[in-house]
């Protein structure tokens, strides 16, 4: 018998059951923890939107002297950013949902509503730097990036140059605004013989918004202390913390330059509470709630502001003593608040 035949005969002696068991043995894999990589894209580029509009933002009042922006005390109030509540009161709420913007069209126009018997001149200007100081004389008008001038009884317009740069929608006060703003615009009147309203200024715009984000706050919160160490403002700019608010240890004054209806909450840390009164460009809707519990005075009025500046502050607090800190919380309300909510709060 050969060796090959010998091996075959030995395999034949192995029981069939044993052979089947050998064939059914399986390899068991030990499980390991696995992870997943999650990527997001919010939103895709095709998700950007385009908005067009025409906004009346100022009615010019002629003057014999050189007056810029109707005498508005706030610097850079007319900066071109969709978050600017003064220039874009409706667009600002839409822009609060996006990170980036770019203008596709900008046209600044003056429409007269007076006749040729009224003297004076009107100038419209655009400056590429939103932090430049306003012009202070007629000589400064041609020094702006672009300008146009005419008699108060002639309409005029200026098309602003457009670039293709995406900028950030400003959702709070920033140190260097020129990085987010597309310059600023100015209006000026001079050489008039009266102080009458002579015409309206409009801004026509087409803007693109992209990169949706959680809605930015539409409530401005600002606070200061008398020593000046603590001063901060967050949210949209209904007023300028640096120029629209003045206060000492015994008084405080606030100037509102925006036309609209606002819910204002004032908290004053003090030793003695005084009175809160409103100026000529403000009317109180309903009853004003106020309370003083040492060491804090609290007031919550609903104010309707005309937006027309004058020498008197919009809100004045007098007769106080020992003021150390002031907190303001301002929210813009819809126009129908005037009719439906006269008893607020």
UniProtKB/Swiss-Prot annotation:
Residues 48-209 are annotated as: S domain, virion shell. Keywords: Capsid protein, RNA-binding, T=3 icosahedral capsid protein, Virion. GO terms for molecular function: RNA binding; structural molecule activity. It is found in: Virion. It comes from the Viruses. Pfam families: Viral_coat. Residues 1-47 are annotated as: R domain, interaction with RNA. Residues 210-345 are annotated as: P domain, projecting. Its main location: virion. One of its GO terms (cellular component) is T=3 icosahedral viral capsid. Homomultimer. Belongs to the icosahedral plant coat protein family. Capsid protein self-assembles to form an icosahedral capsid with a T=3 symmetry, about 31-34 nm in diameter, and consisting of 180 capsid proteins. This is Capsid protein. It comes from Carnation ringspot virus (isolate Lommel).
């Amino acid at each position: 018998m050969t060796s090959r035949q010998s091996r075959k005969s030995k395999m034949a002696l192995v029981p069939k059951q044993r052979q089947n068991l050998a064939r059914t043995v399986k390899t068991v894999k030990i499980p390991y923890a696995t992870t997943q990589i999650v990527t997001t894209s919010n939103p895709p580029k095709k998700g950007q939107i385009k908005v067009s509009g025409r906004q009346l933002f100022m009615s010019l009042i002629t003057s014999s002297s050189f007056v810029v922006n109707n005498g508005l005390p706030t610097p850079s109030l007319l900066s071109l950013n969709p978050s600017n509540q003064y220039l874009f009161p409706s667009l600002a709420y839409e822009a609060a949902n996006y990170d980036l913007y770019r203008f596709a069209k900008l046209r600044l126009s003056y429409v007269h509503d007076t006749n040729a018997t009224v003297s004076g001149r009107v100038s419209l200007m655009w400056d590429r730097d939103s932090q430049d100081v306003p012009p202070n004389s007629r000589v400064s008008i041609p020094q702006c990036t672009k300008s146009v001038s005419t008699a108060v009884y002639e309409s005029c317009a200026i098309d602003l140059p457009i670039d293709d740069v995406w900028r950030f929608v400003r959702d709070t006060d920033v140190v260097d605004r020129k990085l987010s703003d597309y310059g600023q615009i100015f209006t000026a009147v001079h050489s008039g013989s009266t102080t009458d309203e002579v015409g309206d200024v409009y801004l026509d715009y087409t803007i693109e918004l992209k990169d949706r984000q959680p809605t930015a706050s539409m409530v401005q919160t600002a606070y200061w202390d008398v020593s000046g160490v603590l001063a901060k403002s967050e949210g949209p700019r209904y007023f300028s913390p640096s120029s629209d608010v003045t206060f000492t240890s015994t008084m405080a004054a606030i100037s509102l330059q925006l036309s609209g209806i606002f819910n204002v909450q004032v908290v004053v840390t003090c030793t003695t509470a005084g009175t809160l009164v409103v100026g000529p460009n403000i009317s109180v809707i309903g009853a004003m709630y106020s309370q003083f519990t040492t060491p804090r005075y609290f007031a919550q009025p609903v104010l309707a502001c005309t937006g027309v500046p004058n020498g008197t502050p919009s809100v004045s607090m007098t007769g106080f003593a020992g003021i150390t800190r002031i907190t303001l919380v301002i929210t813009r309300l819809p126009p129908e608040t005037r009719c439906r909510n006269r008893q607020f709060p």
